[in-house]
Amino acid sequence: IGAIDSQGRVLWGDQLLILYGRALLQEVPGATIIGEVKCSQSLYDELERAGGVAVMSKVGHSLIKAKMKECGALLAGEMSGHIFFAHRFLGFDDGIYAGARLLEILSNTDESLADLYESLPKMVNTPEIRVECPDEIKFQVVERVTQRLRDRDEVTSVIDVDGVRANF
C-alpha cells in the first residue's frame, strides 16, 4: 500500500505499521507485530510503548510470512508498504485490504491522515546501503563491519538479523 496525506507527505511502510499496530493493540493488547530490518527504530519503540511485542525480521516476503507463523504475529510489514494481516485476515499482504484497514482506522477517529501523521514519532533513517562485494568474502566483510560497529561508543546497538544494522 502507498499512502499520502493531504499535505503531500508520504507515509512509509514503518509509519503505516505504527498506525496499524496502534489500532491492533487497542483490540488485542500484547499482540506480536513484525517489522523488517529496514524499518526505523521508532517503529519498534512505538509498538513496545503501545503494549505490543515488536519483532525484527529479515527482509523478504517469504521470510516475513515464516516469521509471522513462528511468532504467532497478527501483523507484519515492510518498508516497501507490503503489510501482512493475520488479524481478521489470512496472514498475507493485500494492498486493497490494507487500504480498507487504513480507512477503518480513519473512520474510528475525527482525525485526518495528516493529523495521524503528526502523531508519529519524527524519524531519521539512512537508505539501504549496498556495496559490491565478491561472494567468497561477503560474510567476512559483514563480520568485520559488525565488530567495528560494536567497538564504537556512539553505537547503542548492533543488529545482525540480516546483514548489519547500527542504532546510534
Model-derived segments and their meaning:
Residues V10-E27, T32, K58-V59:
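Short, acidic/small-residue loops that bind anionic groups at enzyme active sites
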Residues V28-F168:
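Phosphate-binding and adjacent anionic-ligand microenvironments
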Residues G2-L16, L43-Y44:
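Short Gly/Thr/Asp-enriched flexible loops that form oxyanion-binding sites at enzyme active sites
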